[in-house]
């Protein structure tokens, strides 16, 4: 990269939202849902300029007549054609750049299938002709954004939650744990428990309404049992929400029962540990000498950590698991929804990072598998 004036593009492809922008910016320029929508009905009016597919916000706004699909599930791309549409939309409509002129930094969840990043690499070089690219681990970027080099990141997005311990800038791969329970599962769970209240949400469009209810009204209880008792005895916790058609629904204990599944996955019929226990287990897999530093630097990142009360609850739960004298500090930066992207924006600018890019030339020589050699 001899030219200094060509900014790298940073794209954080989340399962729920795609965050994209230019390296060096302090926030992503474009944030839109990772959705591709296709019409459910036949177009009858000629000249309307109907398209056979819509991406992002446009799909969201026309959701009443579309079937919405998320091409990324649990952090893994399941539909590459749709994924290509999302990238195309990112480059040409959102950022308005020519991808063949900019290096591109992409992000990925740890412990993803190897084929996933190979295919990402292949599409970037062969379809979009990028001059260089790199795939970074999401949680590592979040730690960069928080200004630390040591800590454990609990990153929970829409599709996947993972805990990554990092010491002096090195991720410790043997201690990384991944939990396929995140925002989308909570949305589905909220759909289910609202049905018990007599509100029916079934279509892909209605799921988006429930996601909005979740984001606006849910919170994490410090003491779940006590909160349930409060909700049963008074209506102080009830909130109302107006649906797009003007109907008003009331939601009570669902407000904290929904995110409680993060701490008790058995609510979803899952046999895994909650996020607090996963974080603790991840720390316990690390060398005994560095645990103290990890407990004192537990960083939350991702949209599913945005619930009010989640940091206090994590503090309480981890304190209960850890040795009694241990100092535990949960760091929840206000911009943590975008901290992966912000970390990518920082990384792509570092002078020491410039030799890490995979160039088009290296790709042509080695093929997609080069990504495993050059990207951690």
From Swiss-Prot:
It comes from the Eukaryota. Oxidation of Met-45 and Met-48 by MICALs (mical1, mical2 or mical3) to form methionine sulfoxide promotes actin filament depolymerization. Mical1 and mical2 produce the (R)-S-oxide form. The (R)-S-oxide form is reverted by msrb1 and msrb2, which promote actin repolymerization. Methylation at His-74 by SETD3. Methylation stabilizes actin filaments. The modification Methionine (R)-sulfoxide is found at residues 45, 48. The keyword RNA-binding does not apply. It holds the Pfam family Actin. GO terms for cellular component: actin cytoskeleton; cytoskeleton; dense body; focal adhesion; nucleus; plasma membrane. Its main location: cytoplasm. The keyword Repeat does not apply. It catalyses: ATP + H2O = ADP + phosphate + H(+). The modification Tele-methylhistidine is found at residue 74. It is an enzyme of class 3 (hydrolase). Its EC number is 3.6.4.-. Keywords: ATP-binding, Cytoplasm, Cytoskeleton, Hydrolase, Methylation, Nucleotide-binding, Nucleus, Oxidation. It is found in: Cytoplasm, Cytoskeleton; Nucleus. InterPro entries: Actin, Actin/actin-like_CS, Actin_CS, ATPase_NBD. Transmembrane segments: none annotated. One of its GO terms (molecular function) is hydrolase activity. Belongs to the actin family. Actin is a highly conserved protein that polymerizes to produce filaments that form cross-linked networks in the cytoplasm of cells. Actin exists in both monomeric (G-actin) and polymeric (F-actin) forms, both forms playing key functions, such as cell motility and contraction. In addition to their role in the cytoplasmic cytoskeleton, G- and F-actin also localize in the nucleus, and regulate gene transcription and motility and repair of damaged DNA. Polymerization of globular actin (G-actin) leads to a structural filament (F-actin) in the form of a two-stranded helix. Each actin can bind to 4 others. PANTHER family: ACTIN. In vertebrates 3 main groups of actin isoforms, alpha, beta and gamma have been identified. The alpha actins are found in muscle tissues and are a major constituent of the contractile apparatus. The beta and gamma actins coexist in most cell types as components of the cytoskeleton and as mediators of internal cell motility. This is Actin, cytoplasmic 1. The lineage of its organism: Eukaryota, Metazoa, Chordata, Craniata, Vertebrata. The gene is actb.
């Amino acid at each position: 990269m001899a030219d200094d004036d060509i900014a790298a593009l940073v794209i954080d492809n989340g399962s729920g939202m795609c965050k994209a922008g230019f390296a060096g910016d302090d926030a992503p320029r474009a944030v839109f849902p990772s959705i591709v929508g296709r019409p459910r009905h036949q177009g009858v009016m000629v000249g309307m300029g109907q398209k056979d597919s819509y991406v992002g916000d446009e799909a969201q706004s026309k959701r009443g007549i579309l079937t919405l699909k998320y091409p990324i599930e649990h952090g893994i791309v399941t539909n590459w054609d749709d994924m290509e549409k999302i990238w195309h939309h990112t480059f040409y409509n959102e950022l308005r750049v020519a991808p063949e002129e900019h290096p591109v930094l992409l992000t990925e969840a740890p412990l993803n299938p190897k084929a996933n990043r190979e295919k990402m690499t292949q599409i970037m070089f062969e379809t979009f002709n990028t001059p260089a690219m790199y795939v970074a681990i999401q949680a590592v970027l979040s730690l960069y954004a928080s200004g630390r080099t040591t800590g454990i990141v609990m990153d929970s997005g829409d599709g996947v939650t993972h805990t990554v311990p990092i010491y002096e800038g090195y991720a410790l791969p043997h201690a990384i744990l991944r939990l396929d329970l995140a925002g989308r599962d909570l949305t589905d769970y909220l759909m289910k428990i609202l049905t018990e209240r007599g509100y029916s949400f079934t279509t892909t469009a209605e799921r988006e309404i429930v996601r909005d209810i979740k984001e606006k009204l849910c919170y994490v209880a410090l003491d779940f049992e006590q909160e349930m008792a409060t909700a049963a005895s008074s209506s102080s916790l009830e909130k109302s929400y107006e649906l797009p058609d003007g109907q008003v629904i009331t939601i009570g204990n669902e407000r904290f029962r929904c995110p409680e599944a993060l701490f008790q996955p058995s609510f979803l019929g899952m046999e895994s540990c909650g996020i607090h226990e996963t974080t603790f287990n991840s720390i316990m897999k690390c060398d005994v000498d560095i645990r103290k530093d990890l407990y004192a630097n537990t960083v939350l990142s991702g949209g599913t950590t945005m619930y009010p009360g989640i940091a206090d609850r994590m503090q309480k739960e981890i304190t209960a698991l850890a040795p009694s004298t241990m100092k535990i500090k949960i760091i929840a930066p206000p911009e943590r929804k975008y901290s992966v992207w912000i970390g990518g924006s920082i990384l792509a600018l570092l002078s020491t990072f410039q030799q890490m890019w995979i160039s088009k030339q290296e790709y042509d020589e080695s093929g997609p598998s080069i990504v495993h050699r050059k990207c951690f």
